């Protein structure tokens, strides 16, 4: 028999909010009877932006800004209809981007 699997990918700029959201999803899935694999930490995406401090001259004076995107992966194996309903009702913080694949 073919096993059904839900793959949830979480992204956020702050790792603390991301870990709290992942823990909430795992706890909800386990409570409804599904088996869970994860959260698996994926590599952090790091973007570095360098800009001139001065609007006109002084190329030697620059400022650097960094943007980090933290990612986690959660697999829910054999979800029940109760699991899917509970995951749809879960409330996550605004800073967390969630991507779900069946």
From Swiss-Prot:
Family, per entry: Belongs to the universal ribosomal protein uS10 family.
The protein's assembly and partners: Part of the 30S ribosomal subunit.
Gene that encodes the chain: rpsJ
Sorted UniProt keywords: Ribonucleoprotein, Ribosomal protein
Protein function: Involved in the binding of tRNA to the ribosomes.
GO BP terms in the entry: translation
GO cellular component assignments: ribonucleoprotein complex; ribosome
Listed NCBIfam families: PRK00596.1 (NF001861), rpsJ_bact (TIGR01049)
SUPFAM superfamilies, A to Z: Ribosomal protein S10
InterPro entries attached to this UniProt entry: Ribosomal_uS10, Ribosomal_uS10_CS, Ribosomal_uS10_dom, Ribosomal_uS10_dom_sf
Molecular functions per Gene Ontology: structural constituent of ribosome; tRNA binding
Organism: Carboxydothermus hydrogenoformans (strain ATCC BAA-161 / DSM 6008 / Z-2901)
Designated name of the protein: Small ribosomal subunit protein uS10
Domain of life: Bacteria
């Amino acid at each position: 028999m073919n096993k059904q699997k839900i793959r949830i990918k979480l992204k956020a700029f702050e790792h603390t909010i991301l870990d709290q959201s992942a823990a909430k999803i795992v706890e909800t899935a386990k409570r409804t009877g599904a088996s869970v694999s994860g959260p698996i930490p994926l590599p952090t995406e790091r973007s570095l932006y360098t800009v001139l401090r001065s609007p006109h001259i002084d190329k030697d004076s620059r400022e650097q800004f960094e943007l980090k995107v933290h990612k986690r992966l959660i697999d829910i194996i054999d979800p029940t209809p109760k699991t899917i309903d509970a995951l749809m009702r879960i409330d996550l913080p605004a800073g967390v981007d969630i991507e779900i694949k069946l």
